[in-house]
């Protein structure tokens, strides 16, 4: 059994089954996903987890950020919105999809139907993965379980790409990991309650943070519009990252302890870089306060 760090035990003394082990990957959707994929791959030297390819009604490619894969998705047909945005988080279930659905029902968590995706290999069809949409905040993004049927093989690809990133010294930015995915919700109390039901986790404070082993944490913050607001990425040295981004003209806001990649350079996404040795990621309120108080005079906006 996979066990989620921080799982609580039931009053009877028996531990109920863990439902989620980690953030398996997260993804962005863009009208120009392949161009962004190539930019992150070549400019930031992120190793390939899987090459950009068409899968029928969508196309995607994946790159590693150390402890998690980032998927670049291009959807075929009309989208409700244009541009680029972080759009979804895939959670790995502890067991298979059928067991996960049974546990979702037991916990009273609203969810969608099982959806199997079929791959064709050597003329033979096989189920590559099964997903289950979770009806939990934010409304502006998709949170879902993703059950890869060849999980060891998938994990091996992730691990090899992560090892390659480490061998490259994290690339020119010195990337080590994704520290946090920040989700904006209109009601932190409501959203936190639904995430707690899913994860058996009791976060504290005004901005609840849910932890997943060595993967990225998920932070919930109050926002007028629901969705995935930003990611916080750990780097070896903010000085090194600042110099690289300055040289390339892609440095955004730079304040004490953190820097931001210029959103226009990455499709409008907000990607915050913090030094890995720092004790924790800044809260969104702290980040906004620092940004207002100590804007770098050389920062392009």
Segments (PLM) and residue ranges:
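N-terminal Sec signal peptide cleavage junction
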Residues: 7-9
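N-terminal beta-strand motif that seeds the catalytic metal site of vicinal oxygen chelate
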Residues: 11-34, 84-91, 147-190, 226-233, ...
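Core segments of cupin and vicinal oxygen chelate
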Residues: 18-20, 27-70, 112-126, 171-217, ...
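A structural feature that tracks compact, well-ordered secondary-structure segments
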Residues: 74, 208, 219-223, 232-234
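Alpha-helical subdomain
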Residues: 224-227, 254
């Amino acid at each position: 059994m996979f066990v989620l760090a921080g799982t609580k035990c039931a009053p009877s003394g028996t531990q109920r089954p863990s439902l989620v082990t980690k953030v398996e990957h997260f993804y962005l959707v863009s009208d120009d996903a392949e161009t962004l994929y190539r930019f992150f791959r070549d400019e930031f030297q992120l190793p390939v987890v899987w090459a950009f390819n068409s899968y029928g009604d969508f196309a995607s490619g994946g790159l590693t950020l150390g402890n998690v894969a980032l998927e670049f998705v291009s959807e075929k047909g009309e989208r409700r919105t244009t541009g680029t945005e972080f759009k979804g988080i895939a959670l790995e279930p502890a067991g298979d999809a059928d067991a996960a659905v049974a546990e979702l029902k037991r916990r009273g968590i609203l969810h969608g139907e099982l959806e199997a995706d079929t791959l064709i290999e050597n003329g033979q069809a096989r189920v590559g993965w099964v997903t289950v949409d979770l009806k939990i905040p934010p409304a502006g993004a998709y949170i879902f379980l993703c059950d890869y049927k060849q999980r060891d093989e998938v994990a091996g690809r992730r691990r090899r790409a992560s090892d390659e990133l480490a061998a490259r010294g994290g690339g020119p930015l010195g990337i080590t990991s994704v520290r946090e995915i920040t989700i904006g919700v209109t009601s932190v109390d409501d959203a936190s309650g639904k995430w707690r039901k899913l994860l058996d986790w009791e976060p504290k404070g005004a901005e609840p943070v849910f932890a997943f082993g060595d993967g990225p944490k998920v932070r919930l913050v109050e926002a007028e519009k629901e969705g995935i607001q930003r990611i916080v990425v750990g780097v070896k040295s903010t000085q090194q990252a600042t110099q690289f981004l300055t040289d390339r003209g892609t440095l955004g806001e730079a304040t004490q302890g953190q820097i931001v990649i210029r959103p226009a350079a990455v499709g409008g996404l907000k990607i915050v870089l913090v030094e890995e040795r720092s004790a924790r990621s800044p809260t969104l309120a702290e980040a906004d306060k620092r940004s207002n108080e100590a804007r770098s005079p050389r920062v392009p906006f």
